[in-house]
């Protein structure tokens, strides 16, 4: 279960609750949840190509998607209102920055 909000909560049966706090209040806009679902879908598809995706992994991927979503919104907003198209456009650069930082 993924509950999107200022802090996004993700939990799987028997697993710990994961909380992503990277969101900006500007994500309370039409289509933002769809963008988050798309990011999560891409992560799940990428991992499914390697092996099975169990509920615990799905929860971790949900939390990772929420972090990417929130950071992309911060990148796109520059502190002000943002559209979902701006958030989506910022996703590749956000993922690249996260990969460089690891």
Name the predicted role of every residue range.
Residues 1-102:
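Small-residue (G/A/S/T)-rich helix-start motifs and N-terminal tracts that mark the onset
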